[in-house]
Amino acid sequence: MKLKHFIPIIISLCLFGIFLILPSSWFSGLITQKTLDNQRTSLSDQMLKGTLIQEQMFKSNHFYPIYGSSELGKDDPFNPSILLRDKNMHAKQPFLIGTGGSTDLINAVELASQYDHLKGKKMSLIISPQWFTNHGLTNKNFDARMSKAQLNRLFKQKHLSPELKQRYAKRLLRFKNVENRNYLEKVAKGKISDNDQYVSSFKMNQFEKIEAIKSNLPLANTELADITPVTAQDDSWGMLRNKAEYYGAKHSQSNIFKIRDEYWQLIKKHKRKVNRDYEFNSNSPEF
């Protein structure tokens, strides 16, 4: 066979090899102010499970991070990203971090992975009662939401206390599919050395490069993009509260419990549970 048939393959392998050895710092410039503006309401995987986008968000002085779970993606005109949509009226734009399955443990890992950038920052945490079940975060949600890159960053934070790192490690060891158990066991016992790593430097380098590249790919529209605002940007808090009460009353007329009409229909069709007392336990591991 002629060599020319293999030239495209050889070139592809060479380019791939070059990509692997390039440092992630060469790609960090891809995350610009425009990237952050696009990502702040995207709830994309690269933002939720990455490290570079959130790091640049904290370094910027243009955003106000809001941590939560599924409520951040709700098609509601009182979503903070809709209420505070006008950049001319609000110096800091909401940056939404969280989606369904993002319990307090997931949020705590995200925050701790940026610990050295948190000093002097303001943020909001939306806490949901249904996080605090008997078992806490499920193995399924752990596998889907936990980020190896963020865990690696967490354990490398210079100013995060060893005691807090131990608590993280002990909690993580309770999940059956957590990776690098040997490392976590060392951290839990306080026997970690500077040479130990949760994720290898090579693998972390690849994670960061992929995040930087994907951060500029076209984003799918979220439900937030189709919401028609019902508030004005210069409304006072009193006016916002009155409009919220009116909106809530208008959209909960099908039942005496004042449950949103759409959700009530799901309950009637047995697509949502009525009794959810089990979802809150003061002895939950999430506390």
What is the meaning of each model-derived region?
Residues 4-25:
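Hydrophobic membrane-insertion alpha-helices, especially the h-region
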Residues 29-91, 110:
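Membrane/wall-proximal cationic-aromatic binding patches
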Residues 33, 155-287:
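Secreted/periplasmic serine-hydrolase-like ester/acetyl group-modifying domain
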Residues 37-40, 92-100, 276-280:
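Short, basic, glycine/proline-bearing loop/turn elements
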Residues 45-46, 104, 285:
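A conditional alpha-helix N-cap/helix-loop micro-motif detector
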Residues 67-69, 125-130, 261-272:
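Short loop/turn segments at strand-loop or loop-helix junctions that form parts
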Residues 72-163:
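Membrane-embedded segments
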